[in-house]
From Swiss-Prot:
Organism: Invertebrate iridescent virus 6
Protein name as it appears in the record: Putative MSV199 domain-containing protein 468L
Key words, A-Z: Coiled coil
Stretches of the chain forming a coiled coil according to its record: 178-261
Classification via InterPro entries: DUF3627, MSV199_dom
Keyword Protease belongs to the record: no
Length: 376
């Protein structure tokens, strides 16, 4: 019988099976990723608190570390400071483990605050001049710890093994945390995509129904201004809602990329051109409101322009501003500026017959407002 093999990461962590008890406790504790020290606190992981921080720095740093009296005592060396250090150095020499001793004249001492602190405790300059401070690379410290033959040797080695166990558990925790984040993100993206598809279908049906209704009324010789205004307003609201959903979907995709999560069945990235904002000013053969504005993303702007040309026999584009960062805010500024000149606004429609400007000035004023975005 062949043994079943489990797919694990480089730490031997299985992301498919059930998490271990302490890992499950950490996952249930917070929706945010815990750092390793918070993980130790939450799981009550058994570690010697005296040397945890120092030993962790040795494991993760890639520069030399100062081994002073506190460290040597923790290693199990007894007696005067000089005797402790000499016994430790003798052990290093026997096992051919590299080390370095710094003098007070070495510029490298500036890298070790603990050495500078010890220097301030020495009684006089002569003591400082005769002193040396022991520093070692992280790899060599680990080698030395495994060679210890002091009263604390077994404690040190057990501590080393516990640290390896901690790394393994924390690796399992981070693996399962990212797996959970990926699943949550996938569900949210699927819900958004389904909602967007439903809205697109509904919007398409409404557009077809409105066009059919308008064509039927025109064939009957009926002109219902209020219905037309309501229909245009409804279509604009639908388009704006679709654009907001599209923006949310893009933000979800951006978050997922930052998590470095690969999801096979995800919503496609939106086409850059179709997301560009357009502002159009139209002139139609409408006696009451001859001017009409379209404010939407590229794809929705094209649809709105097509609707206007289906509704009127004479439609001219007087102004077409592409890639405006916010056409909604732009239109608000236009209304604020031109209402003072007597221009009448009704949703997207404009009437200048009772104002003190003509068509040329209307276009010029809108261009002037648009150009203000460059005045930074």
């Amino acid at each position: 019988m062949e043994m079943a093999t489990k797919k694990c990461n480089i730490f031997g962590v299985d992301s498919i099976g059930e998490p271990e008890g302490v890992v499950k406790k950490a996952l249930d504790e917070s929706l945010s990723l815990l750092d390793i020290f918070k993980f130790i606190e939450i799981t009550n992981f058994d570690l010697d608190p005296i040397m945890t921080n120092w030993f962790w720095q040795v494991m993760v740093n890639n520069h030399s570390t100062h081994l002073g009296r506190v460290v040597l005592e923790w290693f199990g060396y007894e007696g005067e400071d000089s005797n402790q250090k000499q016994k430790f150095i003798d052990m290093l020499k026997r096992n051919k483990i590299p080390y370095k001793q710094l003098k007070h004249t070495d510029n490298e001492i500036e890298l070790y605050p603990s050495i500078k602190e010890e220097m301030t405790l020495l009684p006089h300059k002569g003591a400082i001049a005769s002193s040396k401070w022991l520093v070692m690379e992280p790899f060599n410290i680990k080698m030395a710890m495994l060679r210890l033959n002091t009263k604390n040797a077994d404690i040190i080695k057990r501590y080393y093994i516990k640290m390896e166990e901690l790394i393994r558990l924390y690796a399992q925790y981070t693996t399962l945390f990212q797996k959970r984040e990926k699943e949550t993100m996938s569900r949210e993206m699927l819900d958004l995509r389904l909602m967007m598809e439903d809205m697109k279908i509904t919007n398409h049906r409404q557009e077809n129904m409105l066009i059919e209704s308008h064509n039927m009324l025109r064939s009957m010789g009926v002109e219902i201004k209020d219905i037309r205004h309501e229909n245009n307003d409804l279509l604009d609201q639908n388009n704006e809602l679709l654009e907001r959903v599209d923006d949310v979907l893009q933000k979800v995709n951006t978050v997922q990329k930052k998590l470095d999560i690969s999801v096979e069945d995800r919503a496609p990235q939106p086409d850059k051109n179709t997301r560009r904002e357009r502002f159009l000013l139209l002139k139609r053969n409408n006696d009451t409101f001859p001017y009409y504005t379209i404010r939407a993303q590229e794809i929705n702007a094209r649809k709105a322009l097509k609707r206007q040309r289906n509704m009127y026999t004479d439609v001219t584009v007087l102004l077409d501003i592409v890639c405006h960062p916010n056409t909604k805010t732009f239109y608000v500024r236009i209304k604020d500026d031109l209402k003072s000149k007597g221009v009448e606004f009704n949703l997207c429609e404009i009437n200048i017959s009772n104002s003190n400007i003509d068509e040329a000035i209307l276009v010029k004023e809108m261009m002037k407002i648009n150009d203000k975005k460059r005045d930074v």
